[in-house]
Amino acid sequence: AMLSGTQARIAIKLFGDDRDVFILSAPGRTEVCGNHTDHNNGKVLAASINLDAIAVAAKRDDMVIKEKSEGHNLNDVDISVLAPNESEYGKSAAMIKGVVAGLKEYGYNIGGFDACTTSDVMGGSGLSSSAAFEVLIATIVNHLYNGGNIDAVTVAKASQFSENVYFGKPSGLLDQMASSVGTFVTID
């Protein structure tokens, strides 16, 4: 994905131009073998691809995440209360909250941020757009609040937790691990 001038202007309009920003990304993935065995803790082989989700992100001084994806409404997520909410199942806001909750459960720092995102990983394409989005959110929290010190496996596990518990979709670890690690991966 590429950030266009229009998207940069949208980010400035929404979030201002007086803060330090990070530009972060997370790739989609392709399965090489074992996709459905992943749900049963079987062996799998997957790889990240050259299509990705990208964010321009900046810290906030509160426990609110404002995320604006290209072509979608603004997600305004209060992370001061991290309990899952069934009425949010299937929504991006649930993924955001779930990733943050997962990282907090692992003992990492969390906090609010503003992000303007875009993605070449199209929904429904079989390239794990939801995993790329979850890993992107975890990557933002990692760099804004944890100095980039959260390992790829923890990013993947927090993202899977989000998808399973907050988004309401059962999944193995294949999608999130391939996106988080960013190369060929085997899971056994």
Residue ranges of predicted features:
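ATP-binding N-lobe of GHMP and related small-molecule kinases
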Residues: 1-131, 135-152, 157, 161-167, ...
